[in-house]
């Protein structure tokens, strides 16, 4: 018995439907990468394991009105340089906690705007990323540094602005990679002393 053309069409339609469903259900690996300028999502959640950094708790205007030492970090979510700096920003939050106001600011909304004065984040941004600005309790600029700023330089500026002692040197801690995406800081074991 020869199958009718309608049966062949139904059979092929079923096979193609199952094939299409199978392809759509196939798991696709993550495409996030530290080494490209592609948007992967919130860089602090993805690359530093710390999604609590954004959005910031206070605006710059509120932090200045409360006379809080403020750390502004300008970044872009789709910048490899900002992605690599995310672990440093997370470590600064861990060390300084509630002693300072940490305000990470994505720079896209700042572009093409007019500077509205010292309470406006645009006032301090120089058009580079990342950029770190430490403001003292009276709003004075203690540090304004572009690029991948050494964490010890930022610690020194925050210590000066807050009057709190410096945290342990980064030579006692080092940046490590937990996996292909997340970086973090971990204590370095002291070197064994040799006896002569």
Mark where each language-model region is.
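Bacterial N-terminal signal peptides
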Residues: 12-25
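Typically the conserved alpha-helix immediately C-terminal to a functionally engaged Cys/Sec
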Residues: 81-96
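Thioredoxin-like thiol-disulfide oxidoreductase module
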Residues: 90, 101-141, 151, 159-162
């Amino acid at each position: 018995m020869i199958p009718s053309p309608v049966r062949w069409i139904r059979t092929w339609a079923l096979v193609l439907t199952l094939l299409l469903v199978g392809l759509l259900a196939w798991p696709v690996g993550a495409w996030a990468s530290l080494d490209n300028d592609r948007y992967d999502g919130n860089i602090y959640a993805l690359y530093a394991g710390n999604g609590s950094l954004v959005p910031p708790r206070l605006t710059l205007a509120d932090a200045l009105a409360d006379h809080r030492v403020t750390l502004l970090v300008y970044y872009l979510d789709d910048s490899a340089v900002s992605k690599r700096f995310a672990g440093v920003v997370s470590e600064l939050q861990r060390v300084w906690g509630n002693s300072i106001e940490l305000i990470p600011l994505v720079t896209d909304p700042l572009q093409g705007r007019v500077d509205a004065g010292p309470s406006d984040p645009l006032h301090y941004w120089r058009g580079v990323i990342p950029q770190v600005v430490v403001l003292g309790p009276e709003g004075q600029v203690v540090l304004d540094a572009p690029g991948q700023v050494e964490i010890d330089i930022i610690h020194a500026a925050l210590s000066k602005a807050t009057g709190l002692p410096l945290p342990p040197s980064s030579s006692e801690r080092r940046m490590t990679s937990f996996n292909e995406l997340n970086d973090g800081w971990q204590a370095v074991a002291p070197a064994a002393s040799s006896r002569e």
